[in-house]
Every structure is written in C-alpha cells, then in structure tokens.
Amino acid sequence: TGHIAGHEAGAIEATGHKVLTVPECDGKLRAADVEAYLETFYADASYTHMVFPGMVFIAHPSELGTLYSLAELEELSALCRRYDIPLYLDGARLAYGLAAPDTDVSLADIARLTDAFYIGGTKCGALCGEAVVFPRGGMPRHFLTHAKQHGALLAKGRLLGVQFDTLFTDDLYGEVGRTAAAAADELRRILREAGCTFFRESPTNQQFVVLDNAQVEALAEGVPV
C-alpha cells in the first residue's frame, strides 16, 4: 500500500530505481514477508541479473491509518541490519502516529531503529517541506548534491527549518497530533452512532468510512470528491 508504488506519478522509477512490492497486512510490511523475498532473491544463482533490493520503505502511519507496533519495528530493523540494507520510514503523518492513544512507538524508538526517516510538515500545519533525519549521522555523501540534481534543493531552503523549529518548540508538534487524534475519535463516534461502518479500524486521523453510491453523490453536491 506504500504510496511510492501507486502514486507519486512513478517518481521513484523516473529517477532510475525500481519499486519492488511484497504482500501487505493491514497496510504494513511484515518482517517475515520481507525476509522471504530476500531469501528467494539470494537463493537464485542469477540474482546478479535482477533488481537488487536496496532499501526497505515503510510508512508510519500506513496508507490505511494503521500503526506499526514497537515489536514490529524492531523485527524489521533487525532484519534490515542482518541483510545490510537501510530501513527508511515515511513520516508524512508522523505526528498522528505518535499521538495515537494506544501506540507504543516513540520518536526516540524510530530514531533508534531506522537508518533514515522524515518528519512530515505539510500534513501538520507547515506551508511547505518535510524534515529528513539521519539518526546516527549517516547522511549519504553528496546528499545535497543529489537533491539539487533532482530539483529538490530550494533556494533559501533554510527558511523551511523555521517551521520545524516552531513545531518542535513547546511540544506544538505533539499538540497538533493529539488534537487531530481527539477530533478523529469524536468524528468516528458520531459516524458510528449514525450507522456508518468503516473499511479499516484506524487509531489516527485517517478514517475510511464506507458509503454507498447515493451517499457519495449527495456529499459530492456540496463537497468535491
């Protein structure tokens, strides 16, 4: 369900890379499935002729609003280190994952278990930009050069950092997440009382309500879909 596989207009592959997919469970990757893929890849004597699996990409929350548990993250992290490939976490909606009432994953856990992750800004009130984090000082050589080559290095981009400085002052980032989680919980309660059902159970502000075509058409009259 990773959006880089089906959305982003094929941006990853447009840069010369290949997105390899494995089965999902509740929108998440399972370490066992990733390991099965890696074992199959290396068991093939002709693997040098195939696309090399060079990184594991996950999103927290997932595209379905589900969350990785600490145990799941630790399992994926250990697997990646065993195979010497980086674990990258997409944190576009990270504020809402960290604020979910039942999560046992902290920002410190993510920094400890991943090789790179990013802190979403635009889905948390920022006007522009995301903050890429290399937890152990592992920024790739020539990282900024690569960013510039692909049109991702903005002039005066340091100003984007002001937003994150503000978001991480006085726990504003956490407060935004908690406010959204509480609002989503209230919305979920109201919709359930109205008889609505949900495609997946999500503890975040991503809620997937099941509607029939008539309901969608009625809503579309006032709200573009």
Spans of model-derived segments:
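Catalytic PLP-binding core of fold-type I/II PLP enzymes
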Residues: 68-100
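Conserved C-terminal alpha-helix-loop-beta "cap" of PLP-dependent enzymes
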Residues: 185-225
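Structural signature of PLP-dependent enzymes
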Residues: 146-148, 167-188, 203
